[in-house]
């Protein structure tokens, strides 16, 4: 059985890890980096770029460079969060036929899981290159506050990438794994504050180590799936746009190229201000008007940045209060605070968390890598490589159905340990009702329409009877991935209807299969391209080598042989410019055959040089023989002195 890899599929950056011996190890990608930007670009020649290469060309290709796709995964186009992103994203967000939020690239609509799959494929390839064997199984992390649709969409992305997703695990829980496995002794209550690129989570976790076995029990979780570093960047971008407008009278929001440069500069400025008190945003030729080119040079201080994002940092503490209350713990009962996510490097965030908990957060957990490392540990637990860890995670939001009066009736309350199963009996609302619609909801609001609709299905064939008499048993079953399976049964007739919730939207199995086939076709195309490049390089090397040998052969090469070789060289050089691998290989072979005489001459010259060198060496060594003799004094050692 191969390794189960751990993948942190982040909004801004992604990371892959494996369990190496007893410790989780983060794997460096092809560029030598331990994290990979979650950026995908579609180039004009049809090539798909992922990670750093995609980020590098973003400024010149803003409409076809996709980032922060995790903010769209599993979301409806009409969601408030999506509508807000519509105004700030340089790429087109479109409404899918099923009402989901998709993106449009070069006139083609694409689902977020399909795009995220490109990042997962890069993570898969990174692991395969390191391990030297195929990888087919993974544990993928999601924000703890992701709903059912978002979890299902993440699992779909894994499937499209050619991965069997063995488990979806919550990011704060994974970070606690990285912190707690092999380190914690006894019992500790830990708060994991996870502020990443696009999402925020807080989890209160009890870690208990008894006789070498460590139990991780999530007591409560809360969060905001649309709050993160991207929002901090946007505040800086807005500030720079307003300042430039005030100084130059030009609104950069209308210039996509300028906005992309600004995004890059805003992120860099924000990062620099974590260690410096001020920084300059210097962007020459940011735009131009009738008077000529315009340059941006704006000073941003740490105090200014903090004033721009202060409300968001404060907002992040509200879910912390709720999670603490739900866990039944007081602030003083928390033993350790762990910071996860790149945005927690900001001093203001660290101070806000330290002030809230009354203690300094731990510094021994890498905020960018802990989640992937924890996922790798979970992978080892699932494969049986690690047996001394037990995880008890929870469902982040209440799950229920719509009942009479458009009320949501919860069957499974939030923060219930998973996997779990719960049944409840309901009845009809009208006399002689022959069918009921089971409308599945997720959320904490009383009014059904204020919650997230996960899907609905009908139970038909109910025997006519007065309202309230038929007994319909609804069962909710949540698996270890936090994904919901629902069934409804008429207790009198035993008629049953089951569904795995795929949301009222989501991708169908057919759509996923089509995307899997497309991904496989892309992989085959990539392999063909790689082989073509290798063949070109080999042919190029041969051309260079033959030309050098022609020069060295000089007059020794007969004229008709030289003409033949020159013709073969010319044909191979033409073939190298094309895309036909077989043609390049054929012309390569033709050149080798035409160069037979040249090879013989080169061999003869090498042998002649070798022989001449040997003769010269022999005569010089005999001449030096006497010079090399040194008179030495010596003493004979008798046996009895030994």
From Swiss-Prot:
Protein known as: Chaperone protein DnaK
Record-linked InterPro entries: ATPase_NBD, Chaperone_DnaK, Heat_shock_70_CS, HSP70_C_sf, HSP70_peptide-bd_sf, Hsp_70_fam
Biased composition (Acidic residues): 628-642
Function: Acts as a chaperone.
Feature: compositional bias, Low complexity: 602-623
Organism whose genome encodes this protein: Aeromonas hydrophila subsp. hydrophila (strain ATCC 7966 / DSM 30187 / BCRC 13018 / CCUG 14551 / JCM 1027 / KCTC 2358 / NCIMB 9240 / NCTC 8049)
Recorded superkingdom: Bacteria
Positions where Phosphothreonine occurs in the chain: 199
A single MF term (Gene Ontology): unfolded protein binding
NCBIfam families for this protein: PRK00290.1, PRK05183.1, prok_dnaK
Keywords in alphabetical order: ATP-binding, Chaperone, Nucleotide-binding, Phosphoprotein, Stress response
SUPFAM superfamilies reported for this sequence: Actin-like ATPase domain, Heat shock protein 70kD (HSP70), C-terminal subdomain, Heat shock protein 70kD (HSP70), peptide-binding domain
Induction of its expression: By stress conditions e.g. heat shock.
Similarity field: Belongs to the heat shock protein 70 family.
Gene (UniProt): dnaK
Keyword Nucleotide-binding attributed: yes
Chain spans, region Disordered: 601-642
PROSITE patterns: HSP70_1 (PS00297), HSP70_2 (PS00329), HSP70_3 (PS01036)
A Pfam family: HSP70
């Amino acid at each position: 059985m191969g390794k189960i890899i751990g993948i942190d599929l982040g909004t801004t950056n992604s990371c892959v890890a494996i369990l190496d011996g007893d410790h989780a190890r983060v794997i460096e990608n092809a560029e030598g980096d331990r994290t990979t930007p979650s950026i995908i670009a579609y180039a004009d020649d049809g090539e798909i770029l992922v990670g750093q290469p995609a980020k590098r060309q973003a400024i010149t290709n803003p409409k076809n460079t996709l980032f922060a796709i995790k903010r769209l995964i599993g979301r409806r186009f009409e969601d408030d969060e999506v509508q807000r992103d519509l105004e700030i994203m340089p790429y087109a967000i479109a409404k899918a036929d099923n009402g989901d939020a998709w993106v449009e690239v070069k006139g083609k609509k694409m689902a977020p899981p399909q795009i995220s799959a490109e990042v997962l494929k890069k993570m898969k390839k990174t692991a395969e290159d390191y391990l030297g064997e195929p990888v087919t199984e993974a544990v993928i992390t999601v924000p703890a506050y992701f709903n059912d649709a978002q979890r299902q969409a993440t699992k779909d992305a894994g499937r499209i990438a050619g991965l069997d997703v063995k488990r979806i695990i919550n990011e704060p829980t994974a970070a606690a794994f990285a912190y707690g496995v092999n380190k914690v002794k006894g019992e500790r209550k830990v708060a994991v504050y996870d502020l990443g690129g696009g999402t925020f989570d807080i989890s209160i976790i009890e870690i208990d180590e008894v006789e070498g076995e460590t139990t991780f029990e999530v007591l409560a979780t809360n969060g905001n799936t649309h709050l993160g570093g991207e929002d901090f960047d946007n505040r800086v971008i807005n500030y720079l746009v307003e300042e430039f407008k005030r100084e130059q009278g030009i609104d950069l929001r209308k210039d996509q190229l300028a906005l992309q440069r600004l995004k890059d500069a805003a992120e860099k400025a924000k990062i620099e201000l974590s260690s410096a008190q001020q920084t300059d945003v210097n962007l020459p030729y940011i735009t131009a008007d009738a008077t000529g080119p315009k340059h941006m040079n704006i000073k941003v201080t740490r105090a200014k940045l903090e004033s721009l994002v202060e409300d968001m940092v404060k907002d992040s503490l509200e879910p912390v209060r709720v999670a603490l209350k739900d866990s039944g713990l007081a602030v003083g009962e928390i033993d350790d605070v762990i910071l996860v996510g790149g945005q927690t490097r900001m001093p203001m965030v660290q101070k806000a968390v330290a002030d809230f908990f009354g203690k300094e957060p731990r510094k021994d957990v890498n905020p960018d890598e802990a989640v992937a490392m924890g996922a790798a540990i979970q992978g080892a637990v699932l494969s049986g490589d690690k047996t001394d860890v037990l995880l008890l995670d929870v469902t982040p939001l209440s799950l229920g159905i719509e009942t009479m009066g458009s009320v949501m009736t919860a069957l499974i309350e939030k923060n219930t340990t998973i996997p779990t199963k719960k049944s409840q009996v309901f009845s009809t609302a009208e006399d002689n009702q022959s069918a009921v619609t089971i409308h599945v909801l997720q959320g904490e609001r009383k009014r059904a329409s204020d919650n997230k609709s996960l899907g609905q299905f009908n139970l038909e064939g109910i025997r006519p009877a007065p309202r309230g008499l038929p007994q319909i048993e609804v069962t909710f079953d949540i698996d270890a991935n936090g994904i919901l399976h629902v069934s409804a049964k008429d207790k009198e007739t035993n008629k049953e209807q089951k569904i795995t919730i795929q949301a009222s939207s989501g991708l169908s199995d057919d759509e996923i299969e089509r995307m899997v086939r497309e991904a496989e076709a892309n992989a085959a195309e990539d392999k063909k391209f790689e082989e073509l490049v290798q063949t070109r390089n080999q042919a190029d090397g041969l051309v260079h080598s033959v030309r050098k040998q022609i020069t060295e052969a000089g007059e020794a090469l007969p004229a008709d042989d030289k003409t033949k070789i020159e013709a073969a060289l010319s044909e191979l050089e033409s073939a190298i410019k094309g895309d036909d691998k077989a043609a390049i290989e054929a012309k390569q072979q033709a050149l080798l055959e035409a160069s037979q005489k040249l090879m013989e001459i080169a061999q003869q010259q090498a042998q002649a040089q070798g022989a001449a060198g040997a003769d010269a060496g022999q005569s010089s060594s005999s001449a030096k023989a006497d010079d090399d003799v040194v008179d030495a004094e010596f003493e004979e050692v008798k046996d009895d002195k030994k």
